[in-house]
Structure formats: C-alpha cells, structure tokens
Design a protein with these regions (language model features):
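A residue-level marker of the well-folded mature domains of exported/periplasmic proteins
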Residues: 1-196
C-alpha cells in the first residue's frame, strides 16, 4: 500500500514537472507500521527540514498531534493521507474504511457460501482505521449474513509476524474458521503464512 502511495506521488510530481513546475517528492517513514515514536521523530525532522508542504498518515489517532501542531506553527501547509489525527483538523485524502470493510465482508461471504465461521486480525487498536475496519466488517457481517459467525477478533498491530502468530492461535482455537479478514495487506501476508 505505502509503496503504491509513494509511486503515485512520484508520478504526480512528474506530471507537474511536465507542466513546468519544480516538484520533488520525499517519502519518509518510521521503521514499522506500529512505530509511533519513530513516526513522530520523522515528522519532527520533516517539519524542521526545507519542505514546502507535508502530507502525513498518522499511525494512531494522536501520536503526531504535537508534531503536526509544531509544523503548522511554522506555516507549513499540510494534509492527511489515508488516516487522520483526531486532534488536528487538516485537509485530507483518506480511505473510506467503512466501505472497504463492507466490501471485504461481502467478498468473504460470497467465497464461503454465506455460512460458517470467520475471524478478524485487527491493526493497531489506537488507530481509527483498525477500529473502523474491524467494527464495520463485523457489523456488516452480523446484519447481512445470519449464518456467518465472527468467532474471534485479535490485534496484530499492523505487524506481519504478529498476524501470523495471532492467526495460528485463532485457527487452533477455532478449527472450523473458513476465512480470516486482516485489516491490511501486511497482516494478510502473515495470516497467509499461518494458513499454509
């Protein structure tokens, strides 16, 4: 996902260059999708750098609040990408987590014949995206597929290795699970490793 975000930004920059604008895209990230302190460090460094604008995707609801406010005080234009900070209102281009979760629920229901047990591997619990993707998936399943039971929900914090371990635990406790919904592609790869 993040590689695609970076590639899309770079492609947009190239298109703007063709129009005569001088645009450079720099992508920086924390060491992992649950490294909230690392992301704050990166954000502070960027706000102290020579950037004309910053687009940010907070890992949690509030880990970047102070860093975003500091960048705003310096007059750096900012926007959100994918997720928002709960405390600072900025323009945003974000995913529709409800729609994504409902599409996943429909797809899974179709694949398992609209009956059976399913489980959820959730991202970082302090991230709105993880909560929305999980809650909307479960709510949609419950409301629309009475013969499908969500038997387990566990956090894996956006981490592939944790997702593999969580999925292994879920499958041992619930051997009749027909599908596992992961909140992101990184965790889905871990779930896939557990299933193999």
């Amino acid at each position: 996902f993040w590689r695609m975000e970076k590639e899309g930004s770079e492609a947009a920059a190239e298109a703007l260059k063709e129009l005569g604008l001088d645009v450079t895209v720099t992508a920086q990230a924390a060491s992992g999708e649950s490294d909230v302190q690392g992301q704050e460090t990166v954000m502070k460094a960027m706000s102290n750098g020579d950037y004309d604008a910053i687009m940010v995707a907070p890992i949690s609801d509030s880990n970047l609040t102070a860093a975003i406010e500091a960048a705003q005080e310096k007059g750096i234009p900012m926007s959100y990408c994918n997720d928002k900070d709960a405390n600072v209102d900025l323009p945003s281009v974000v995913a529709d987590h409800k729609d994504t979760a409902e599409l996943a629920a429909k797809w899974i229901a179709e694949k398992i014949g609209e009956e059976g047990q399913v489980a959820v591997v959730q991202g970082l619990p302090t991230a709105e995206a993880a909560r929305l993707r999980t809650d909307c998936f479960v709510d949609y399943m419950t409301a629309n597929y009475p013969n499908i039971e969500v038997v387990a929900q566990q956090n894996a914090d956006w981490d592939r290795t944790k997702a593999k371990d969580v999925a292994t635990t879920i499958l041992k406790a619930n051997p009749d699970v027909k599908a596992i919904y992961a909140n992101n592609d990184t965790m889905a790869m871990g779930v896939l490793e557990a299933v193999k």
